[in-house]
Amino acid sequence: SRNNAATGKVVRVIGAGDSSNLEIDLIVAQHKLETEFSDQALDEADACVLDVAGALASGYRDIRDRFVFTIDPVDARDYDDALSVEVEGEHVHLGVHIADVSGYVPFDSALDGEARRRGCSVYLVDRVIPMLPEALSNQLCSLVPARERLAMSVDITLRKSDGQVLAYEIFPSVIASNARLSYDQAQALIDPAPHDLIDAFRKEAAPFGAVELDDE
């Protein structure tokens, strides 16, 4: 009735008034972004293992001898695509390698349901809300250097003179990334000035604890 006071129940407290992350927390709440995974999905992710021998026996192609590299923001935590480039005479062989998530996420599993419901990972100013648990997104499905990983690869043969696509092939593969480059480092490799490369590597390496030694 009109004389009864309205009642309610607090279901969630979003940050605090002095929290530096309050605005981001509000964005997460406003758009109903899911930040937690179900126990079943977490259990499925934790149970995933990399079986290189099994993958090769089932038809994955072994291309671990290729020089493969990733290019991502310097603060990226998951690396889901990689490249390889080989020049042979008048042809350029370009390889595009995408982390094979399907090798770990069976159709209609709890993980599959989480991924379909979320649709993508969400990158915010101070955090990443992953599409899959970190056991997959940051580990088994992340193409980090010196680690064997399952991938879906596209081999593209280009004519060197004009970049015309001459042939392509798509196949599951086992790769091992050789290098992780930032955008600045990759651009410095493309640019002719050698000091750009040196400056980029020094700038990007410092936050990760690189130590510069004086050889004099």
Describe each region flagged by the PLM:
Residues 5:
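Gly/Thr-rich phosphate-binding beta-strand-loop-beta motif of the actin/hexokinase/Hsp70
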Residues 2, 12, 16-17, 24-26, ...:
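Electropositive polyanion-binding surfaces
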